[in-house]
Amino acid sequence: MSTSHALPRDYAVSTSSQSQLVMAIPEPAEYGDVPPPDSEPAVIGENEARRILRHIDWRLMPLLFVTYMFNFMDKTILSSAAVFGLREDNNLKGSDYSWVSSVFYFGYFFWNYPTTLLIARLPVGKYVACNTFFWGAVVGLTAACSSFGGLITIRFLLGVAEATISPALMFITSTWYTRDEIPTRTGIWFAGNSVGGIVASLLAYGIGHIDDRLHPWRWMFIVLGVSTFLLGFVLLLLIPDRISNARFLTPNQRRWAADRVVIAGTGSTENTTWKWDQTRECLQDPKTWLIWSVALLCQIPNGGTQNFANLVIKSFGFNSLQSTLINIPYSLICVAAISGTGWIAGRFRSMNCILIVLIVIPPVVGSALIQCRRQIPHGVSLFGYFLLSTGPASLPLIMSLVQSNFRGVTKKMTMTALLFVAYCGGNIAGPHLFKSSEEPSYETAFRAIMICYALVVVLVLSLTLYLQVVNKRRQHEEGITGNAGSSGLVGDRVGVDVADARNVTKAVNEVHLRSEDYEDVTDLKSLGFRYRF
């Protein structure tokens, strides 16, 4: 068990190397309902703490899960629509379908950075709800498309609409949860992605039987569009904008929830302003670009397989209806991979990068099997396709690295924006690796997938080594052990043992937080802050 080190309130670092880690404390901000500076800590018993955390989980996790489920369904139903007449009804030729797939990410890229600014500045619950109304309307209007131009336009707008969802959910998660809880909670709501794949497959299978003058693919977008629009009302009523106005908690519970993320999270996200010095720090931080590169290389395979999945399955000899059902076991494997790796990453602070390496190995094998499809039975090729299903689990692990290792609202949101620039770039490039001239084998695409994931392994190992070196250097320079479960120096103690939830509750009850502990400070300037890897 690590030992807590008492430090005076006016503690200052004297050496030149340490002085770079300390920033001047600005004037205290206004904190609204949470929490009065320099006051007594919120005292909550261990059983009560577990009950409050469950209450928070049951309020937030279902909402985030369902939102992300619709986020995935509305985006990827295109793959099912493609085998139910969308290409023919919109007269798509040659690479037109690839452009329809990838233009979504141009819209996403266009709105990515502006929306991260708005998430940090606006009431996040209301902003997400209003965005969902627009998003649902765009999905429903896709059914009215009858040309390549119309489809391109509506898909671009869908990218704009959905650009808010992932960054907002990441922001909400880091607002409410500790560094040890973030990977597991991210895994829970991100699993909605794969459950959405199952629901979308069943929906496509059911709607595919409709014999109507309105073709099945149009009904898919109508049903999903209306459902998404209605979801907006639920989010408007139930998602709190911040901890201090969460009406489902009492004032003392809100204080406890706010204190725990200051002690064991990545700091308070309330009453902050956009700080351009944090943007510069993010851009100059080596771990920013290592994580960015890993995200880009993981998303290139995702962009292609996500949009060409049903076409690849159909090439194995299955019809349109069968190809939609075959995606169900694929999605189930994906759910297991996302949930399992999220739980492990939350339980063990040095497993995140190792898990990324482990989950990208099966897709390499799967791509090799599909590439050799002419020499092997269709059943083996289908098995190779199922091996691709662990690849999407890399993104929530990368998100967790960002949420847990970046402190400072502006720095974290800048990194979030960069993360989704990589997400867009990979998903724009991915579909164009599936060349229509190589249909149905797509040799270039599956060769590229193998190369991308091989490079991911190299970069992730480099990131692990870098973060280990930085942790050791900071420990030597600061003279403080620190740990990867706390937010660093808070109150009159540092190195608070937060090995599990009981330690967090004990720390919240005992540590007298000061007004400066709620200030918006980056990870590089937080004494005792150590990185997870």
Regions of interest found by a model, annotated:
Residues 1-70, 94, 236-268, 443-533:
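Intracellular terminal tails of multi-pass secondary transporters
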Residues 126-140, 353-368:
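Structural signature of the two symmetry-related core transmembrane helices
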Residues 110-149:
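Conserved MFS/SLC helix-loop-helix module at the cytosolic interface between two early adjacent transmembrane helices
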Residues 79, 277-342, 399, 431:
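Extracytoplasmic gate region of multi-pass secondary transporters
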Residues 90-91, 114, 122-123, 144-150, ...:
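Helix-breaking motifs and short loop linkers at transmembrane-helix boundaries and internal kinks
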Residues 110-123, 337-351:
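Helix-to-loop junctions at the C-terminal end of transmembrane segments
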Residues 79-110:
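Extracellular/periplasmic helix-loop-helix junction of adjacent transmembrane segments
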Residues 183-213, 227-228, 416-430:
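Glycine-rich segments within core transmembrane alpha-helices of 12-TM secondary carriers
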